[in-house]
Amino acid sequence: MSHPEAPITPEVEADLAIARRGCDELLVESEFARKLACSRATGVPLRIKLGLDPTAPDIHLGHTVVLNKMRQLQDLGHNVIFLIGDFTSTIGDPSGRNSTRPPLTREQIETNAKTYYAQASLVLDPARTEIRYNSEWCDPLGARGMIQLASRYTVARMMEREDFTRRFKGGVPIAVHEFLYPLLQGYDSVALKADLELGGTDQKFNLLVGRELQKEYGQEQQCILTMPLLVGTDGVEKMSKSKGNYIGISEAPESMFGKLMSISDTLMWRYYELLSFRSLADIAALKAEIDGGRNPRDAKVALAQEIVARFHSPQAAEAALAAFEARFRDGAIPEDMPEVTVGGAPQGILRILREAGLVASGSEAQRNVEQGGVRVNGDRVEDKSLQLSAGTYVVQVGKRKFARVKLVG
């Protein structure tokens, strides 16, 4: 839709502040302010698009960073479009890849898509969310339509993309079909007449292609808003199921609570900024209390309870806290436990115990496991061959020995 000039009122400034919170970039901010102003003046909501490819059946907290932003804009009264990339998933997004991504079959995509929206609905308001599948307009394109779409973008522009440039210079093959992915994602914005598209920072190139294609098709260009990629529980790499540093939103309350309690105090504040629904003023006040001497554990408990309550219930959050505290009732978790980094993930529990200095020998490690004296994130280890993937873990031997172990690949 076309957005004529309208005054930038204090209400518009407040809306803009909500959009800016935690975002990496808002392009072009002046254009988006104009769109917001026109929407308030006319009462016509903006069309806000978020596309996700159902490449895996589960959504983790990293995905919810952009979903949270979508919900904030939804609560301002705008129309949000949750786009499931069932067609583009058959190509595979090359964003951030050092090699060609294996495409999924339609059967895999359909299986994953069934759970995607159900999980996303834990963040978005289902009654006010439009669900679309990009096969609606991509399937009918056919060969002629695909060639016509490809004619609207140049190879030179496509090679401006950092991961394509890196692979080309490194002699790593780039398949022609990978050039089609950003074009099709951009064409989604044309089909939906999007006013704003959301995505992670790794999606910036694709989102900008959407702007360019809308211009090519005679539409007003969408603005783009990118959100940071959430660092996983290991505090090093972005949250990813393949890295083992993720927290799934459908995980059991106790598991979710325990993983959140295992993150570092520094990372906790980033999680507050990107995952909490508390105001920035409330978070700043809480941080000031911690800086003034209050136990950081209190802030971490509050964060864990908020997130567990959101995806389960307040009662489940209380029960998860009680279970967590019960695990350590006989031996309190020390304020400043030693932190150890162990390489070679995935790694066996016996070696981890030795590397962390919790035992003096392999035989001692094995004996402690066999006697039920070893816990990881509060759960008793019963298998001496247990392998832990990359992530951060609170490892306990007996009642008094603790270490925060960061396991890296």
UniProtKB/Swiss-Prot annotation:
Task: State the top-level EC class.
Answer: ligase
Q: Where's the S4 RNA-binding domain? A: 347-407
Q: Where in the cell is it found?
A: Cytoplasm
Q: Name one GO molecular function term.
A: tyrosine-tRNA ligase activity
Q: What is its main location?
A: cytoplasm
What the entry lists under PROSITE patterns is as follows: AA_TRNA_LIGASE_I, S4
Q: What is this protein called?
A: Tyrosine--tRNA ligase
Q: Which organism is it from?
A: Bordetella bronchiseptica (strain ATCC BAA-588 / NCTC 13252 / RB50)
